[in-house]
Amino acid sequence: MALVTCNFTSPSPSSGGSDLRRWNQIIRNQVLKGNVELAIHSYIDMQKLGFSADNYTFPLLLKAAGNASSLRIGLTLHGQTVKTGFCYHLFVQTALLKLYSSLGLFLNARKVFDKMPVRDAVAWNSMLYVYTSCGQMDNAMEIFDTMPSRDLSSFNIMISGFAGAQSVTSARNIFDRIPEKDVVSWNSMILACMNAGETAEARTLFEAMPERNVITWNTMVMGYLNNQLYTKAIDLFYRMKAGDIKPDYLTLTGTLSACSHLGSLETGVNIHIYAEKLKQASSPHVVTALIDMYAKCGSIHNSLAVFYKSKTKDIYCWNALISGLALHGFGYAALKLFNQMTVNCIKPDDITFIGVLSACSHAGLVKEGCEMFDSMKRDFGITPKAEHYGCVVDLLSRAEHFDSAFQLIERMPFEPGESVLGALLSACVIHQDLEAGEKAMELVVKRDWCLSDGEYMMFSNLHASCGQWEEAERWRNMMNDSGIVKTAGCSEIQVNGRFHKFLAGELGVE
């Protein structure tokens, strides 16, 4: 931690307790402002001047450690509370509990909790929170059942925990036991339903709520988005827009993502105009969502316009545009943007390389793609994942470098998954290379005898592309005998502001 110069007059130790209170106030102000380093350095300066921390100082410092997610600082402070005897004070014990809760260290938190001679509501709820945030719902339920008294926060923490565990029945049991529910209770229960895929029940709760806040609407919009009900997400956004509660950046990003999935440029443009009106269009989250939406809706020039207009570009903005350029086959432009990104001292991450490698694959830039793959670990310290190997296998296979693709698969530090083998098989079908295709089929069967409908169809199509009709029919029959049904294709179009869904084989519209 770098030395920080503090612009304040240091209290004198000869002044006594009043100046200790001044030190505590200085530290408190710095913690509230998020100046964790200043808070810690003030504590160090305070000790150098002969002041000792008390049961008010340590909770402030422990809060600073929690805000910085610094286990090292937290453990050091915990050790000092033990040495000074303040570890037995309720304020300090509660602060330690909150620290370990924020860091997800439920064993450390439980040790502190068990040693507390007196536990207030904050202590009980902190212990509940640490268990629920770590997914330890059985332990959380044990604490909940043994609590001498429960407040509304206790119930809400439990509902949120069960929501994260996708246990909607348990969440509902807690929800129904609440004497007086607040908006947090309802929001948490809606989240539990959405996480479990029970969107109709979530909507019923939403309509029954006595009051809603922006989090309520966002929970519904994101819930629909995560359950692939994109039209419902957009419809709800327009209903929210017509009401008293204004959408925030989360609402806008969620709805723009729904537009991306639907390919609805018209709706996306309308939301962009509305975001400008709300003065939210310059938010990095919204900028990223706009870049992604325009690219996936076929308007890459608008993606570029949004990107270059933005004054603040984080890693997500760069990644969104690189992926967008890849989607449109602009390989050299994606590589140029990658270089521009590094010149601007933006460090690429694993998502960046997925975009760049995908761009090289779509543009047929074999040499450049292989060089980028090699540079991941060498120049940026990023270990390639299955998705990166999948991109390079796709790159090599598209260019008919099947020997190199198989060699890369053999060198992989893990078993090839569906994304890797799927890319290989798909290229074999396109290039009608039966020899490479049969070798790829062996790898798929070796990996898992439970083939997907897509893999059965690719095996069949491979033989059909080479004129082996009987073998193609045999694979289709094997799929039918296994009880696997090919997933029907689905399309949605927007007509006069309304979305209509078409399923393959259907005559009507939804």
Regions found by a protein language model. Give the residues of each.
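Terminal (and in a subset, N-terminal) low-complexity or junction segments at the ends
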Residues: 1-123, 129-151, 156-510
